[in-house]
Each structure stands twice: as structure tokens, then as C-alpha cells.
Amino acid sequence: MLYIVATPIGNLDDLSLRQAKTLVSSDIILAEDTRSANILLEAIQKRFKDLQPKTTDLKIVSYYKEKEFEKLPQVIEWLKEGKNVSLISESGVPLISDPGYLLVKTVIKEKIPFTVIPGATAISTAIVHSGLPAKEFAFLGFFPKRESEKIKLINKLKAIKEFLPEMIFVFFESGQRINETLKLWAGSGWNPDLAICRELTKKFEEILRGKVSELTDKQFKGEITVVVR
């Protein structure tokens, strides 16, 4: 059985009992980041003392985007042997801007059973923090790195707003690039409301709200989720 397991997006106290039970019951954990996976298992042992791995041979296997195609046949073989395999990303829900799509696509084709163990996402958390109406929203993944691609996407979103004025957009951006993105946005002639959500659920969580033009000179570090209306 394959389990797609969400993990905390920053605060390990958000770890659920169901997530913990699933992981310690696994034969194999496919981890985008093995170091994060080991930290997570240590957190489970501290927070859920009655839970112990069902096997001392629990494997943690590195499974990141660039290696997904290469490792897929072995994972499918494990599943057909009846192994319990859990997929986790570094944080949040796998497949959402994280590895796992090829695996899920293949198990559906092969009629191998799988289920999702849900949990927090930076997307929904940021939308609530933003204070913006969320009747309709679209998630864009990571914003483009190249200036030309940024400008092209900003113009596309601006056009979408003409047809769907209530739509809000959510995307990930790095602290190193966010200022450039905001300045390009301000220069596009579109000055929307937005929220910049930094280090969500962590000790130094910070939410900045305002117009794009009001936030272009701020300095940001860490992991950033942006909500734009």
C-alpha cells in the first residue's frame, strides 16, 4: 500500500497522530530530504512515546524530483510485494510543487491502492493569514526565476483578473528574489493587494499586508508564500 503523507510545514507540534502512525507502520519511507525525515521520526518518538516502528528494518530512501524516474521501478516492485510505502516531502503535502506525480500516476495505471494522509499546507495557511476574500483561488507553484518569464506571468494574471475579478493567486518565492518580483509587479501598472507570508508556523513567522507598491523596499529572508488579489 502506498501512503502519501503530509508533514508539518514548519512547526513539528502540528504533526498529527494519524501521520505518525502511518510513518512508523511503514516498511519504507520515500523522503525528498532524508535528514528532514530522520528529524521527523525523532519527533514522533518524543511526542508519541507509545508508537514504535513496526520493524527495525524501516528504510528511509532518498526520493527527490531528479531521481524520481530512476527509482520508480524499484518502488513499484516494493508495492507489488505488499510493502507499506510512505511518500513524504521536505514539508507539507507531496506532489504540490514537490516530487510524487510520476509515482501516483503509475500506481493509478497499475491499479495499486494508495491513500492520502492529509495535513497542513502553506497555501491554505497563507490564504487565511492574508485576510483576503478566498472565494476563488489559483496556486501557481514557484514563481519564475527569469525576469522575462516573471513579466509574462504577471501580464497573464492581470488579464485573468479582468474575467475573474474575485480570483486570488498564491505562489512560492524565495527571500532573495521577492523584491525583484514585487518591483516588476509594481512597474506593470497593476498594484494589487497582497500578503507576504514568511516562515509560516515557525518561531519567526511574519505576515506583511498591503499594496505591492508599499512592500517593494522591504527585506525578506526564509521561505515565502505570497497571496495576491
Whereabouts are the PLM-identified features?
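Glycine-rich, flexible N-terminal cofactor/catalytic loop recognition
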Residues: 1-65
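A contiguous loop/helix-start segment that scaffolds small-molecule binding in enzyme catalytic cores
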Residues: 2, 162-229
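Short glycine-rich anion-binding loops that position phosphate/pyrophosphate groups of nucleotides
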Residues: 9-12, 90-94, 175-177, 202
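Acidic beta-strand-to-loop metal/phosphate-binding motif
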Residues: 31-32, 86-94, 168-173
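Alpha-helix capping/helix-boundary segments
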Residues: 35-37, 92-93, 122, 177
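Conserved helicase motor
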Residues: 61-69, 142-148
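Glycine/small-residue-rich loop that forms an oxyanion/phosphate-binding "nest" at active or ligand-binding sites
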Residues: 64-121
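Class I SAM-dependent methyltransferase SAM-binding "motif I" and its flanking Rossmann-like core
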Residues: 102-160
